[in-house]
């Protein structure tokens, strides 16, 4: 069932969205009163609901009718959201807000159980300036690029393949001290319950990964086609091969000033060369975030921005486990932490593992040049 949600939209935006979506929605929701319980049958490991959220923002990055719709979705669709997959189309009257609004919306819906495709956002700012680089490198007009990107995103949504494997591989990346890091300790509580997952851990030590300096586009593409990068090093020798083989990545992220640590951001930035010529659309993204005080959602949203919206990793339901712990080792005393770790491990297993052999077709995808 395809549902189009378009709260408080102008007629021009409605007409544009109708042109961009190559399917006829089964249900269109413009306001909260139209969100009612859905009599949709649910099949195991198959989406019951395909959701397109088309949101037209005002000049402060808001939409007055969206929140009542979201509350109604949580009230009436709490069960079916766990069997849904979604994408966004967001238009802003200025150059701001499309990304920050989208990561906020994705984070909250994901916490309710909604899954998101890789590259889930089609964004529109004035004169489609966000598509300027693609116009320059492809010689295709921006309006045509908008139609092309929209159609590909909707096709990914409607043909979504929840890839399960009898031998799933999980690559875990961290830059933490094994002895004192609360984040690493929480990961080990989770790891105890991942018996059916093939796990490979990578410690990104200080200075081992040089950050991206922004090579010219053609240079980046040249190295990407060779599964390489101008700087080489551990990124090419170890991380890229492991990421290529993995079904999912799990990032262990202590909260540093409400941001991902510099070492891990260097890895994310350096993924760009590989991403130029290879697709991450069939791989899933998980994270564990531990904050000293607050702000775990800020780190989670940074990962959503960088790896789901920009790099194209799928976002499984409730992708992030977050906790608060300040003193070294205090995570082990947090309320219900072992229960939460076990529940998160079950979530990872459900997203990756199947007891019978299947062909993992979801690895296919197009590079996002």
Task: Annotate each PLM feature.
Residues 1-75, 148-274, 330-369:
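N-terminal beta1-alpha1-beta2 submodule of the flavodoxin-like/Rossmannoid cofactor-binding fold
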Residues 28-36, 116-126, 201-205, 315-324:
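A generic structural motif
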Residues 44-45, 60, 65-92, 96-99, ...:
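General detector of N-terminal leader/presequence modules that precede the first folded domain
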Residues 84-130, 140-149, 280-320:
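Short, glycine-/small-residue-rich phosphate/pyrophosphate-handling segment
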Residues 125-134, 248, 321-328:
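A short small-residue
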Residues 272-366:
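Long, contiguous alpha-helical scaffold regions
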């Amino acid at each position: 069932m395809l549902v189009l949600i378009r709260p408080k939209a102008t007629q021009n935006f409605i007409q544009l969205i109708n042109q961009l979506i190559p399917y006829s929605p089964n249900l269109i929701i413009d306001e909260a009163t139209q969100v009612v319980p859905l009599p949709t049958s649910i099949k195991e490991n198959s989406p019951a609901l395909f959701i397109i959220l088309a949101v037209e923002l005002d000049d402060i990055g808001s939409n007055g009718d969206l929140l009542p719709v979201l509350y109604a979705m949580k009230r009436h669709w709490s069960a079916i959201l766990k069997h849904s997959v979604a994408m966004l189309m967001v238009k802003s009257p200025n150059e701001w807000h499309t990304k920050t609004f989208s990561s906020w919306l994705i984070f909250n819906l994901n916490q309710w159980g909604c899954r998101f495709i890789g590259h889930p956002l089609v964004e529109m700012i004035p004169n489609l300036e966000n598509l300027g680089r693609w116009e320059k490198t492809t010689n295709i007009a921006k309006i045509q690029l908008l139609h092309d990107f929209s159609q590909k995103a909707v096709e990914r949504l409607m043909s979504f393949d929840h890839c399960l494997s009898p031998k799933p591989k999980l690559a875990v990346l961290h830059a933490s001290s094994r002895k004192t890091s609360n984040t690493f300790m929480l990961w080990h509580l989770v790891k105890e319950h991942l018996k059916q997952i093939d796990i490979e851990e990578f410690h990104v030590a200080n200075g081992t990964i040089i950050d991206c300096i922004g090579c010219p586009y053609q240079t980046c593409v040249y190295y990407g086609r060779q599964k390489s990068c101008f700087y080489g090093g551990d990124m090419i020798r170890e991380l890229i091969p492991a990421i290529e083989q993995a079904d999912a990545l799990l990032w262990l992220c202590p909260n540093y000033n409400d941001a991902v640590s510099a070492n891990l951001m260097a890895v994310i930035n350096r993924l760009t060369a590989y991403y130029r010529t290879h697709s991450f659309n069939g791989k899933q993204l998980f994270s564990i975030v531990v904050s000293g005080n607050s702000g775990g959602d800020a780190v989670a949203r940074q990962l959503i921005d960088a790896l789901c919206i920009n790099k194209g990793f799928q976002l499984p339901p409730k992708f992030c486990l977050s906790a608060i712990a300040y003193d070294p080792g205090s995570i082990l005393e947090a309320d219900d932490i072992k229960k939460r770790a076990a529940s998160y491990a079950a979530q990872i297993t459900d997203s990756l593992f199947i007891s019978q052999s299947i062909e993992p077709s979801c690895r296919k995808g197009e590079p996002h040049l």
